[in-house]
Amino acid sequence: MVRLKKSFGQHLLVSEGVLKKIAEELNIEEGNTVVEVGGGTGNLTKVLLQHPLKKLYVIELDREMVENLKSIGDERLEVINEDASKFPFCSLGKELKVVGNLPYNVASLIIENTVYNKDCVPLAVFMVQKEVAEKLQGKKDTGWLSVFVRTFYDVNYVMTVPPRFFVPPPKVQSAVIKLVKNEKFPVKDLKNYKKFLTKIFQNRRKVLRKKIPEELLKEAGINPDARVEQLSLEDFFKLYRLIEDSGE
């Protein structure tokens, strides 16, 4: 019997209806390559294999779970014992659909890694904490990761999933989100862009002129006395380009 490890933040989704809904949101067609993050006991893996995909890669860090997944025995399935928060998705193909019930303690890192691999991931469907889903949409306590993701993807809220649909039940509500690639602004150096965003989100209560030269804010058409949460997606990009060009 497979044991769940608390350190991995594992909560297994056991609702057949929700599992099917997640798979449906991927719009799997014949010839598609799908990457599942954190296959666990294979509940979602088995549902995905009911679709006409060409190849299913499952990235799973827990070695005990890896052996369990391999026992499914489908020739289209390949299990990879790696950390999905660092794994180069694009090494698996040029166009991938990524999916997963993400462990809560590393969900943000996996989503960040998905953005770094955006050139080969036009679509991703993830289960995350409801609070994380709302933040990513920019509807609640927007942070740097929300802006980072929304620069390259539309974030769609699919459904809320209550704790009773998991084993063991988490203490919080969960949600399914769908990321659809829609690069709104051309950013070449993603690590530099992340550095800019994390810096601007530090000391959120400070007005922007305390963090960024006032002349750059005015050139971007931004009120120097505004705070970071008042900026639009376009504001962030304009400011980033100006700072990049000025060498600040």
UniProtKB/Swiss-Prot annotation:
GO MF entry, a single one: rRNA (adenine-N6,N6-)-dimethyltransferase activity
UniProt binding sites for S-adenosyl-L-methionine: H11, L13, G38, E60, D83, N101
Record keyword Transferase present: yes
Keywords noted in UniProt: Cytoplasm, Methyltransferase, RNA-binding, rRNA processing, S-adenosyl-L-methionine, Transferase
Pfam families referenced in this protein's UniProt entry, alphabetically: RrnaAD
Site (Interaction with RNA) residue list: N105, T198, Q202, R204
EC number: 2.1.1.182
Locations listed in the record: Cytoplasm
InterPro entries named among the record's database cross-references: KsgA/Erm, rRNA_Ade_diMease-like_C, rRNA_Ade_Mease_Trfase_CS, rRNA_Ade_methylase_Trfase_N, rRNA_adenine_dimethylase, SAM-dependent_MTases_sf
Catalytic activity: adenosine(1518)/adenosine(1519) in 16S rRNA + 4 S-adenosyl-L-methionine = N(6)-dimethyladenosine(1518)/N(6)-dimethyladenosine(1519) in 16S rRNA + 4 S-adenosyl-L-homocysteine + 4 H(+)
GO cellular component: cytosol
Listed GO biological process terms: rRNA methylation
Gene3D superfamilies, A to Z: Ribosomal RNA adenine dimethylase-like, domain 2 (1.10.8.100), Vaccinia Virus protein VP39 (3.40.50.150)
Transmembrane annotation, as ranges: none
Cross-referenced PANTHER family: DIMETHYLADENOSINE TRANSFERASE, DIMETHYLADENOSINE TRANSFERASE-RELATED
Function text: Specifically dimethylates two adjacent adenosines (A1518 and A1519) in the loop of a conserved hairpin near the 3'-end of 16S rRNA in the 30S particle. May play a critical role in biogenesis of 30S subunits.
HAMAP family linked: 16SrRNA_methyltr_A
Family statement drawn from the similarity comment of this UniProt entry: Belongs to the class I-like SAM-binding methyltransferase superfamily. rRNA adenine N(6)-methyltransferase family. RsmA subfamily.
Protein name: Ribosomal RNA small subunit methyltransferase A
